[in-house]
Amino acid sequence: MSVCFVGDRRQMRSLYGKMLRLQNRKRPLVENGFYYPKRWLGNLVVRLGTDCQEVYCRGTWDNLRLEKSVLSFCTESAWQAPFEVLQLIQKVYPRLEIFFSAIGDGWDFYLTNDKEGRFFSSRFELDMPPENDYYDTIEEVAERIGAYIGRDIEPSKEAVYAAIDEFDETNEDMDAYINLKEFEVVEFWEVL
């Protein structure tokens, strides 16, 4: 999950400082079995004044950055996205606005609360050879799939999904595939 915070600069610097100090410690605040034990989300939960047994915090953070007026980091977690950690951050820092983009391949969800695309503009993940990529519009997706299958596709969701279905039915090459995932735009409170 990728996360961005905007809002009160003092609160942003406070959160950034806590996370930076946690990841720069010689030993983790709380002993744990994670690969990056100092960046375990449970350390942040404890630093924010809550018992790590009360908040789902299975995972770590990475790529912590404070640039201009935006604090950002990524999380890697198992079983589910760490939305409860974000809820705790919002409780401790109520003047920060949280934007996220969460992908759960194993959970088969693609979520964002960034309606305007301020930080996370991608609305589609297109997985097909040679690699997967992200697109902001259905027009871009239709153009890319059309180039892959060798024909023009009307830039609508219905036409794109119909072209994918037709390709899947007629394609015999096991190395040729098209998987399209669409990000659902949700309110932050909906994921809690």
Segments (PLM) and residue ranges:
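Intrinsic low-complexity, intrinsically disordered or marginally ordered coil/linker segments
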Residues: 1-192
